[in-house]
Amino acid sequence: MKLLNMKPAEKIAYFMTRLYDNKLTTTSGGNLSIMDEDGVMWISPSGVDKAHLTPEDIMWVTPDGVVHGKHKPSTEYPFHLAVLRSRPDLHADLHAHPAALVAYSLERKLPKMDVMPGVSALCGKIAIAKYALPGSQKLGALIAEKFAAGCDTVLLENHGVVLGAESLERAFMMFEALDFAGRTGIAASMLKKDAKKLTETELAVKNVKYDYKDSLAHDELEIRDEMINMCHRSYEHKLFTSASGAFAQRTENGFIINPDDEDVFCTTADMLVRVEGDKCESGKVPSKYAKIAGMIFEKHEEIESIAFARSPYIMGFAVSGAEFNSHMIPEGYICLRNTMRHPYGTLETAPEKIADTISIKTPIAIIENDCVIVAGTSLLNAFDRMEVLEFGAESLCDIEAMNGTIVPISNEEIREIEEAFNL
């Protein structure tokens, strides 16, 4: 994973802005910390607008316990200090109160980490810490106890969540993955379904690696810029997280795709990976979706762009087995047409089944407990379909939450739409 070339104070201000902009914290809530190589802990301040933090606002605590800076440190700094001093392998803490994870903390129940691959591996061992007064030594001791026992993620009763990692970049990716997993679980509950847990054997399927020869140079700058714009847009619209989501775009002799294990929002055009057959750009590792992307492009000349996502509402359908019905509104059907569903593990064990069935007329493939694959005639078309898919899934979840009855467009009305719009 590429780390940002920033000083600790700059990094804390940057990620706090991202937290706030993504509605994962409030003006007064949440705090971030970094322990540097000299044993100095940098931490966000107390009582300063989280939407407009600057590096000059960040506080620091030296090894002798002296606090420096123009504000007061976060009231939670005792537990940051306790955790980072007790775990030398951790160099960053993230604490926040996103709505979905607070819901779990109020129920005093852990979000399911094993309904999608990669979440548990990224977030590490998770536990719940007993409630204690915010900012108290008691709370710090309760949290530090869980981290000392090997946890990297701790849910706080009636409070929020704390994550520790080797870098703030990694902690942020863990946090967004956990939040999306929590929101996916809530969406499944709204559908009155239980999310299917994956077994260790099923999760192990994801250990399959594909080797690519390092032999290509990168080009297609215009395509790369457009892909980055779409990645940012998808992230800002909560379709991607820093840890999940990718686009693939056809080129003359292959395709370009996101790199593996990089923050989606921080990915730059030069980091995207060009793939041709079994070759890719030197020194780069393409997304885990490169294999299926190549197969789809090879089989379907009309498909120019592909999106891969784990957006929470549609993933509620993917992890629960609930049926997604695209016959909701005319605009939705025109955009989405028909969807296909494949069992978990198909990406690794039988990718040709996905490549054979996806098409412009059936552009959506829901891979159970894994992801959705969206095919389009352009990057914008793929993005539009992905966005409409998530909006539609949210509407269906809302109907279930209201204990309502879905009245879809009839088959006769669907035929009328198909004739009118030449579908």
Whereabouts are the PLM-identified features?
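Glycine-rich flexible loops
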Residues: 1-423
